[in-house]
Amino acid sequence: MQVKEQLRGLPPYQPGKSIEEVKQEYGLSEIIKLASNENPYGSSPTVKSAIAAELDRLAVYPDGYARALREKVANHLGVKETQLLFGNGSDEVVQIFCRAFLEPGTNTVMATPTFPQYRHNAIIERAEVREVPLVDGRHDLEAMLKEIDENTRIVWVCNPNNPTGTYVNETELRAFLDRVPSHVLVVLDEAYYEYVTADDYPQTVPLLQEYEQLVIMRTFSKAYGLAALRVGYGIASESLIRAVEPAREPFNTSTIAQAAAAVALDDQAFIRACVEQNRAELERYYRFCEEHGLKYYPSQTNFLFIDFGMDGNEVFQYLLERGIIVRSGKALGLPTGVRITVGTKEQNDRVFETISHMLREKQLT
């Protein structure tokens, strides 16, 4: 038996190490996981009761249209309910658009490094992948425009970008959209939207009225703290959503996930508190890096990429053996550093202490 040609040699996604895995491997009792950009403060206190209220309905299929959640998200964004596409995490939304638009003979344009699932799903659909290197950690939109031709179907802009945390501002984005041909879909991945504090970050929902080919993706996995439940969504024109709906699997978001996301969306006070604490801790990371001569990309997310000027796997391993899980830049296309999720003050204190010790040992400061 043989799988499809495009799957041969295509590696599966490798998530960061789990807490239990590290405990067993290194005999540690306390682990800090700062590898997957999860919310260290959890989710809204209202989520648990919303989940408990659904436990008697586990034998019943979920609402495949996610009506209650759809209504809340539409009201929150000021869009029509028919402009929304829900997925089992925004990963599935990526998959749906690739399934709907890409095929052999087409191509897709993206930055590198960026969120890897754009490339992964494009390869599965046997489309050509055109990758444009970041410049100073940021999208090179001019170079991306030059890669577009008559066979281009999707351009991906991760904003803010993962793994660098940098962003495309409103002026840059508008200038880019004005030059993208009308036959090309532009997907803006805003997974970290809630964490952004930059004044010139684009508010993209109103742009849907100006650019018919625009898609915005957001998620409940990051700031809302519902990564385990897998709820993401796309926002686009009614006609575009209608066209791609057949590519969506039925019942793709669970009853529990829908209920949890709906109440989490209501608790914007929780989100504001998380964002405020995240920004304060990011500033502490900046000061730490500057005091120790470490390069970093200023971030509009809940993570920071730090360039140590050495093998990222070595930094990753040093921290791992001391109970701190981060992401090696080698796995992300930035081999001389690591990506660290911004944790609580106590977690970050331990990170600073451990990195300081490492730098003294290796005499990198």
Swiss-Prot record:
Pfam family membership, one: Aminotran_1_2
Catalysed reactions, semicolon-separated: L-histidinol phosphate + 2-oxoglutarate = 3-(imidazol-4-yl)-2-oxopropyl phosphate + L-glutamate
N6-(pyridoxal phosphate)lysine found at: K222
Keyword annotations from UniProtKB, A to Z: Amino-acid biosynthesis, Aminotransferase, Histidine biosynthesis, Pyridoxal phosphate, Transferase
Enzyme class: transferase
NCBIfam families xrefs: hisC
HAMAP family: HisC_aminotrans_2
Record's protein name: Histidinol-phosphate aminotransferase
Name of the gene this protein is made from: hisC
